[in-house]
Amino acid sequence: MLGSLFRKVFGSRNDRILKTMKKDVERINLLEPEFEALSDAELKEKTAEFRKRLNDGERIEKILPEAFATVREASRRVFGMRHFDVQLIGGMVLNDNRIAEMKTGEGKTLTATLPAYLNALPGKGVHIITVNDYLAKRDAEFNQPLFDFLGLTVAFNIPGMAPEDKKAAYQADITYGTNNEFGFDYLRDNMAFAPQDRVQRELNYALVDEVDSILIDEARTPLIISGPAEDSSEMYRKMNELVPHLVRQEKEDTEEEQGDGDFTIDEKAKQLHLTEHGQEHIEELLKEKGMLDADDSLYSAANISLLHHINAALRAHHLFQKDVDYIIKDDKVVIVDEHTGRTMEGRRWSEGLHQAVEAKEGVPIQNENQTLASITFQNYFRLYNKLAGMTGTADTEAFEFQSIYGLETIVLPTNKPMVRDDRADLIYLTTLEKYEAIAEDIEECRKQKRPVLVGTVSIENSELLSQLLKKKKIPHAVLNAKFHEHEADIIAQAGRPGTVTIATNMAGRGTDIVLGGSWMAEVEKLEEPSNDKIEKIKQDWQKLHDAVIEAGGLHIIGTERHESRRIDNQLRGRAGRQGDPGSSRFYLSLEDPLMRIFASDRIGTMMKRLGMKEGEAIEHPWVTRAIENAQRKVEGRNFDVRKQLLEYDDVANDQRSVVYDQRNELLDEGDISETIVAIRDDVINSVISEYVPPQSLAELWDLKGLEERLRGDFHIELPLQQWLDEEDHFHEEVLRERVLEELVKAYQEKEEMVGPEVLRRFEKSIMLQSLDQHWKEHLAAMDHLRQGIHLRGYAQKNPKQEYKKEAFELFTEMLEALKLDVVTILSKVKVRAQEDVDAVDEQRKAADSAPREFRHEQSGPAAEEPQKNTDNAQGQPVRKGAKVGRNEPCPCGSGKKYKHCHGKL
């Protein structure tokens, strides 16, 4: 109350910032007559003038008013579109490392041209990030004439481009693309074999469209590049056969958990847990199938993979539904994005879940993958020098933007007053009653010739409603993941009088619904366009547009509340654009997931007490408040999930930064011999210390063991025991110096044989190959550590602190293993000529040409648009005979694991 009173007297911080920016808008408006008087050539010259002033040390903020005036005038000449004052304010907000909340239809695409132009002037590049490839290409092509006029280069970055095309795209002043593609390019650059293979340059300025969708909805799980691991398809099939024998325990109270159920389900957390009875039952079933020894336990260390597979199978059957979480298309399980309702071709869930769903549906099971590189969006976007974003709905997540990204949210006023009528929610007892009421509302709107957009949260719901409308003979179009090929056509005409469109989650669709339909879409259909035909289409459209406005504009119907208020607001925001009339209403039932999980019992009891009958609905502030509280709970939980992910990933991020910086230095260096010398000294001293404890008596030395180690790992024969017996002053320091001298001498002989240039290249190849291999294994170790670390809480230990401590120990061990690896390989391998170096490079390239997946895992966890790696695609050699596993004994007979012996190269 006091805060509200304070804001009334002094205004909010948002108001004060807007007030300051309005003064800059006035300055830009005063420049307008001067810039209107410039010729095209003079206006184009402004870009070179601004660049010179920046090179001379002038600050970018000083140039802002003139730069914005230049873009506004150029836009007027090129597009016939003049930036509104509100769009100028939006441009300033975006230049100041902030988030601009701009309502639907306020012209975000045009607003973005202002900060993009200004921040492209220093020549370091601007990345404009969109939610899908279609929008990236559309916006780049739409704005290209404007930037061409101003002398700036524009490109788009989409999956499947050749490396040289990608490199050219990143060299452009302004590059459009998706968040996933920019992130994957960063990871790919840090897996490159040569400096020229990298495509990105310095990450300068990122402008994120639909920033809430990208930095919040998609930030729960990381971007992952993975490669094929071992085949375990048969295991998934066997586990799938066990699931029908397992029974869910209905009661989840701990007191009643000793019942006969095998597992419990936590719908809120989308988790599943085995009961004690379930563990025993599964062990019996596994023993019957011969998958578990008679005296063995499911929880013994050797059987962890069995537990992993049974858990994945249970989750596939009980937590993931066909036509809600995924669809079957061309004999493949295709994930449906819970945020946008789109199918995500090739995207895969991790942790074996996708394979378990494939086994459940009886489609071919794809192999599991191993992580090669990974980063979260939080840590990727924090690499940019400047970051800004825009969306229609950011205010509900303002705290998260501020706390995680350091981005302040500024809510911009609309250019014209908002007149949309947002009606109160209607709550019914059952889903059937709710859908009947929705159908009646649609029929009423059709009588009034009003267009209707119905938003559903899943494909299943959209098809259910579609069947109901078909029975009632109400014509309609369905826009969901199954038919998104026709999406643009459907949306283009969704504003025509009496049109009914059913759409799964509209978030991130990126296309405005224009009242009366899109006359431009009609023009594009003309085989032979002429001015007369275009004018006729425009006149017909104007009549339809006026008729829809007269009828009350677009009506939005929500079939249930989403777990995030922001997604509900995005659906509502489809109506009432640019001051148009419109209305919205949500229809709910006690059977909706959000109501069932969070609010059902209390509200259900209250509704029955009020004497509600079948088909009746209630509108009451208490109920609305209960729903909003439920949404806040979910939003709070999701924020905690993302925050926790970031806290854990920050540990990995520090390690990632060290490894990637070191790797890039290696790539850029022509000669790494100094690094090799330093590593060799460290390794030899460590090895000697294992057999000759520092400052110890000679009686405690294990010289025989050291001789064998030097012979086996470094290929040098030294009579250490003989030296000790024959020399009076053979102290520890003398021993260390002598061993190092002999190792250096042997290495110098190798260098004289092949020449320094060949050896320098070989050193670099081995160093990069070993670093990549150890980093890959380290990522797997970090994954395993992360998955089990929460159990430390039962031992009264802080899991995060334990994770930090053990992650550091793992990282230290990895670096030591890497150094030993490099020195032993360089000591043992005989390099005869340049061909041997080329052979190592070819092996690295062959490993790289193996099929890869590029995944962005969603909360499931699910993964993004895996594109198969098409770069350097080569035929794979055919291996005759059994493949040697990395952990199996080496066939050479050394007694070591294959990965530590001949598997190194």
Swiss-Prot record:
**For this UniProt entry, what's an example GO CC term?**
plasma membrane
Which keywords accompany this UniProt record?
ATP-binding, Cell inner membrane, Cell membrane, Cytoplasm, Membrane, Metal-binding, Nucleotide-binding, Protein transport, Translocase, Translocation, Transport, Zinc
UniProt-annotated location(s): Cell inner membrane; Cytoplasm
Q: Identify which top EC class this enzyme belongs to.
A: translocase
Which GO BP terms apply?
intracellular protein transmembrane transport; protein import; protein targeting; protein transport by the Sec complex
The residues the record assigns to binding Zn(2+) are C890, C892, C901, H902
Q: Does the keyword Protein transport apply?
A: yes
MF (Gene Ontology): ATP binding; metal ion binding; protein-exporting ATPase activity
Q: Which residues bind ATP?
A: Q87, G105, E106, G107, K108, T109, D512
Q: Which residue windows does the record flag with biased composition (Basic residues)?
A: 896-905
Cofactor note (record)? May bind 1 zinc ion per subunit.
Required cofactor(s): Zn(2+)
What does the record give as EC number?
7.4.2.8
Question: Mind telling me which PANTHER family this protein's record contains?
Answer: CHLOROPLAST PROTEIN-TRANSPORTING ATPASE, SECA INNER MEMBRANE COMPONENT OF SEC PROTEIN SECRETION SYSTEM
Summarizing the function annotation, the protein's role is: Part of the Sec protein translocase complex. Interacts with the SecYEG preprotein conducting channel. Has a central role in coupling the hydrolysis of ATP to the transfer of proteins into and across the cell membrane, serving both as a receptor for the preprotein-SecB complex and as an ATP-driven molecular motor driving the stepwise translocation of polypeptide chains across the membrane.
- Indicate the family of this protein: Belongs to the SecA family.
Q: Which NCBIfam families match?
A: PRK12904.1 (NF009538), secA (TIGR00963)
- What is the protein name stated in its UniProt record? Protein translocase subunit SecA
Question: What is the scientific name of the source organism?
Answer: Idiomarina loihiensis (strain ATCC BAA-735 / DSM 15497 / L2-TR)
